[in-house]
């Protein structure tokens, strides 16, 4: 499929051919769901922890005699039924990551790109660059394009001035091609690719 290439000043500067096998696949919500869950699970820190009975600070003395008191027998004041005691079956430090086949991850990225095309939310620009690292200047240019929630994906390296200028603009993210992922594509309303990004993504996903 063909689409227009524009500049950041909203001027049409040419056309580009988008590969149908990458930007025109059927949109499957189940694949996107699996990919987003995989990403979010993988980045969880998993450092939640409660103390077991062996880790609780306190006496190890038996609180009272086993027999003769008429009360239920107790062996430790660090047990879970006492104030300040341990937690039974509480969370432990662990990784939440789970496997997702490479083919599914690849299909999910194609699906996310195709979903943006299907929604009319994909824009191709000639370059994502800025003459100076001034946020005000870039914000004005994005305002002309009507971009309020946007992910920019550039080539192998992101323009330094553009990255600095966009850093303080809310809901504007910038990634190099190798950082392109399903979650970041879906969490922003509009996806903007540079021509270099299109070429790199097609090479990566073919």
Swiss-Prot record:
GO MF annotation list: rRNA binding; structural constituent of ribosome
Keyword Aminoacyl-tRNA synthetase: no
Alphabetical list of InterPro entries matching this protein: Ribosomal_uL4 (IPR002136), Ribosomal_uL4-like (IPR013005), Ribosomal_uL4_dom_sf (IPR023574)
Entry GO terms, CC: ribonucleoprotein complex; ribosome
Renumbered residue ranges of the record's region Disordered: 49-73
Keyword Ribosomal protein among UniProt keywords: yes
Record-level GO BP terms: translation
Taxonomy, superkingdom: Bacteria
Keywords associated with the record: Ribonucleoprotein, Ribosomal protein, RNA-binding, rRNA-binding
Subunit structure: Part of the 50S ribosomal subunit.
Family recorded in the similarity comment: Belongs to the universal ribosomal protein uL4 family.
Record function comment: One of the primary rRNA binding proteins, this protein initially binds near the 5'-end of the 23S rRNA. It is important during the early stages of 50S assembly. It makes multiple contacts with different domains of the 23S rRNA in the assembled 50S subunit and ribosome. Forms part of the polypeptide exit tunnel.
HAMAP family attached to this UniProt entry: Ribosomal_uL4_B
Protein name (database record): Large ribosomal subunit protein uL4
Source organism per UniProt: Paramagnetospirillum magneticum (strain ATCC 700264 / AMB-1) (Magnetospirillum magneticum)
Name of the gene encoding the protein in the UniProt record: rplD
């Amino acid at each position: 499929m063909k689409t227009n290439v524009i500049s950041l000043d909203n001027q049409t500067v040419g056309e580009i051919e988008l590969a149908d096998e990458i930007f025109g696949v059927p949109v499957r919500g189940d694949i996107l769901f699996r990919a987003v869950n995989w990403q979010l699970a993988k980045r969880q820190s998993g450092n939640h922890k409660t103390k077991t009975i062996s880790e609780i600070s306190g006496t190890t003395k038996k609180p009272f005699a086993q027999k003769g008191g008429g009360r239920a027998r107790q062996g430790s004041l660090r047990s879970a039924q006492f104030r300040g005691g341990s937690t039974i079956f509480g969370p432990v430090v662990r990784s939440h990551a789970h496997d997702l086949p490479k083919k599914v991850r690849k299909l999910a990225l194609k699906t996310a790109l195709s979903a943006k095309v299907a929604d009319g939310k994909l824009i191709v620009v000639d370059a994502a660059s800025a003459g100076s690292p001034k946020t005000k200047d870039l914000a004005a240019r994005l305002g002309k394009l009507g971009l309020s929630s946007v992910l920019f994906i550039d080539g192998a390296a992101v323009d330094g001035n553009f990255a600095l200028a966009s850093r303080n603009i809310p809901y504007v993210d910038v990634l190099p091609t190798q950082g392109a992922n399903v979650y970041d594509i879906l969490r922003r309303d509009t996806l903007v690719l540079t021509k270099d990004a299109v070429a790199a993504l097609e090479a990566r996903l073919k």
